[in-house]
Amino acid sequence: MPRPAPARSRLFVVACACLVAASPIARAQAPGPPAAQTEWRGVGRVIAFADVHGAYDEMVTLLREAGVLGAQDRWAGGRAHVVSLGDLLDRGADSRKVMDLLMRLQSEAQSAGGALHVVLGNHEAMNVLGDLRYVDPGEYAAYVDLEPPGLRERLRAAWEKANGPGSGSAFDQKFTPGYFGHRVALAPDGRYGRWLLGLPVAVVVDDTLFMHAGPSAVLRGMSLADLNTRYRTALVEYARQYSQLEQAGLLQPGDAFAARPQLATERLAARSAGGQASPEFEAAVKGFTDADAHPLLNPDGPNWYRGAALCNEVAEGDVLAPLLEQFKVARVVVGHTPTRNLRAVTRFDGRVVKLDAGMNKAVYKGRGAALTIEGPKLSVRYSGEAQATVPAPEGLYVAPNSVADAAVTAALTAGTVSVTGPRGPAELDVVIEHEGRRIPGVFQQRSAGDARKEVAAFKLDRHLGLGVVPATVVREVQGQRGVVQARPAKWVSQADVQKQSLRAGGWC
């Protein structure tokens, strides 16, 4: 049975709950209205860019070169429609400036007869919901002016009272200057949170669907309006349920995002053990757990799903094709997944365009990329390059981590094999070391004939361009004949799924 929290911990929980509940962080949510329209036909010229991640200067440079910004960085796009694919936030210090500019440009574009559409990315949703794993310290610092007067001091005093004299430095490290201003501004009823919650998760312009990550089977049967309404409802419901638990002290500022359901459950159990539980608390924890598990907010959701960006085209085509037909479009343009060559590429015979070329140079070493669509013609303009180019096909198979198969098979053949443990009947987990590279893999005991079949399956897979079978060579390990396959640490086969009754992930 869980034990009640120590008195000092309970004191800080109560103090935080009272202070935060009295602040704008946990007021009753009043998000902005949803986008009135999410589909436009007959536009003619569309420009799109992806994943700014706080790189304000790079974004401005790109939009100037693409003709979207003119004198004094005002709207110069005329009647064109411009689409941001989201992920404005995190990893870069200037995300507040990015939002300020795009909010202004939306109004200016409308006045000029054009439009600026901002599609919600997973990092916007994460910030609104308090998942702050990727917030750059400079992003917090940009919100110092929005911290409620006295809130930091009161919370710091409560922390020190709960944790003892001298513990304030730990508070300062956990909640850096601007943290509470950031939470106020990006809360569902905050200046930026209201704007973000009013953004669509997907838009259609002419014959193109624009979405941050990609469409999955979860979207089957939904209209574009349904998708946007359901996604926004899921975000608002999560925020509402979280607010209730925070005010009740069952969740606290700074709790790890992924641990929230477990923490709320454990704290509820501790209260029950102390005779302080109530049906209202139990219902609140249940409601929050359900909101956290909503399929649109999880790996199959439109802000996370990478199937169209990464999965085998033969298998994923059965997912993609009916969804494009469902939304009555010829293609989908996505960000979220940086391309390996940091250039815009196409997949599925042009039905998917991957546009995340790593605009934030400090993090991704890439460049801004602006895709222009005019009828059937697609071209990409990169920052600092004078000429636009046509996005090239990525190809059916791309070697993992950009390591060529020849290099992998050479390492598997000549490298030193170390056994790390048993994997299953006649199988061992191994590590292959070769020329400074460590490759995780699996050794499978096989007869000479079966080993040749395994290698033949690998070669046929590559000949067909599928990329399903891992690199495979014939080897002896611990005196046993068989094959060694290179496999990522968390790789599982369909046989593993069946044997262990595993729950499959959201994409390949």
Residue locations for each model-derived region?
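Conserved ATP-binding subdomain of kinase catalytic cores across diverse folds
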Residues: 406-507
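FAD-dinucleotide binding site
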Residues: 212, 402, 413-415
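Feature recognizes metal-dependent phosphohydrolase scaffolds
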Residues: 27-396
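Juxta-kinase regulatory segment immediately upstream of eukaryotic protein kinase catalytic domains
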Residues: 395-407
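Intrinsically disordered, low-complexity regions enriched in serine, threonine, proline
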Residues: 5-7, 24, 472
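Bacterial N-terminal signal peptides
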Residues: 13-23
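Bacterial N-terminal signal peptides that target proteins for export
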Residues: 1-13
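Short linear motifs in intrinsically disordered
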Residues: 2, 190-194, 360-363, 413-423
